Amino acid sequence: MSKVDVKIGADSISSSDEILVPSRLADVTLAFMEENDAAVPEITPEQEKKLKRKLFLTIFTFVSAINLLLYMDKATLSYDSILGFFEDTGLTQNTYNTVNTLFYVGFAIGQFPGQYLAQKLPLGKFLGGLLATWTILIFLSCTAYNFSGVVALRFFLGLTESVVIPILITTMGMFFDASERAAAQPFFFAACMGSPIPTGFIAYGVLHITNPSISLWKIFTIIIGGLTFIMTVVVILWFPNNPADVKFFSIQERVWIIRRVQASTGSSIEQKVFKKSQFREAMKDYITWLFGLFFLLQQLANNLPYQQNLLFEGMGGVDALGSTLVSVAGAGFAVVCAFIATLMLAKWKNISALTAIFWTLPALVGSIAAAALPWDNKIGILANICMAGQIFGIPFIIALSWASSSASGYTKKLTRSSVSLFAMGIANIISPQIWREKDSPRFLPAWIVQIVLSFSLAPAILLLIHFILKRRNNQRLKNYDENLQNYLDRIQLIESENPSSIEEGKVVTHENNLAVFDLTDLENETFIYPL
């Protein structure tokens, strides 16, 4: 059999026909699996069904609840704006936009250092620390009385929240196989799209308080902060670092989880060493930058949900109480659409790009109608604003999951996520500024930017990514068996603290499991890209 050249990053060692990978560069679950794997039998279909049910009831519920609170916190400023916040702090439409911009300045700045810390530190403990800081900042928001104070708090809130979603997505990747994760992503993000439902009802209740001793927006913020505090305690006590140490699964179940994930993805579960070679590869891989460009363009529309309550009131005939109920109805519609998207992805394979394009269409149509309808058609404009402002979150969800799952190698995954979310942060720095007070009440320039860039050009980029990855898959599938055997023949793990020394290491063979070596998708030509 002719050998295919196996290219591995600089952290590995090539000796004649062998590639030796130091054990410190292997999957962090390796030691756990070496101790327990042999004693655990293969999972039966009935056991796998029970395991999947338990995973969704525990891990999935856990990360979805955190995600819900994250977006409830993000929405506080939007609801505070109709609860007397502007009057107490002296904000105007333009300074409100600046506050939103500064939140995403912090969000963008936090991406690369935050993702680096997420790799180096225990994931669960790091998340607990972020949530504790986030809770403190939410409560401190009640002390803000001017523009400077609001800006400072929102900047640090953006900095703190910047890597929470990547941590949640990484956690999903550790516990669910590739098909489950792809199908569950819209359902997972239904939590964020549905956040206006509980938030809107809380605001609706607060608006009914008569003769309050403190401002209504402060009462609202304290309630949201209290919920976040409870979640912080739960995360610190029970959120897992990885499948090897999750407290509410048996050792046998942990082994099954690791086997399933590694078998379906062909990549490692977690890696605590930051690999410069994988970082460089991620930055050179043009797929990384295509995803970054998608998020830069698509997220120019992301200020629309935060503008909704102000748009509703600016139309006239919709008061503060009415705008909260309209937001709740719009969020309910978005959640239903997210469930439908989940069913689509579960039923049909390799349709990520097409599904994202399909769910961009309501936002495109809604934006065109909101900009074009006569101003006296209040009901029509209101309905189309709701349609435009809620549904475009689904393509974002699909793309964020796809950006991660289409990369292999732990450092490369984190680097690509950082680039994607940094681009999202830049877009959200720009986004509030397209809603200029002088363009009110119709804001036609903002609608045009969203129609052309966010809802037309951005989905076309996902289609381009689909065709590029499909071409790579076709090339790999031609020689799949030969490539797989070649890798298994040549790559071995060496137990050594000194990665530059072969002699002092002990070679350990891991047959038929390339996942433990933490190879990237370009290093491992048996990696098949999800589409």
Swiss-Prot record:
Residues exposed to the Lumenal side: 76-97, 142-154, 208-218, 307-324, 374-378, 437-447
Keyword Endoplasmic reticulum among record annotations: yes
Cytoplasmic topological intervals: 1-54, 119-120, 176-186, 240-285, 346-352, 400-413, 469-531
Entry's Gene Ontology cellular component terms: cell periphery; endoplasmic reticulum; endoplasmic reticulum membrane; membrane; plasma membrane
GO molecular function: cysteine transmembrane transporter activity
Compartments where located: Cell membrane; Endoplasmic reticulum membrane
Taxonomic superkingdom: Eukaryota
Annotated glycan sites: 146
UniProt modified residues of type Phosphoserine: 500-501
GO biological process, any: cysteine transport
Topology versus the membrane: Multi-pass membrane protein
Protein name (Swiss-Prot/TrEMBL): High affinity cysteine transporter
Biological classification of the source: Eukaryota, Fungi, Dikarya, Ascomycota, Saccharomycotina
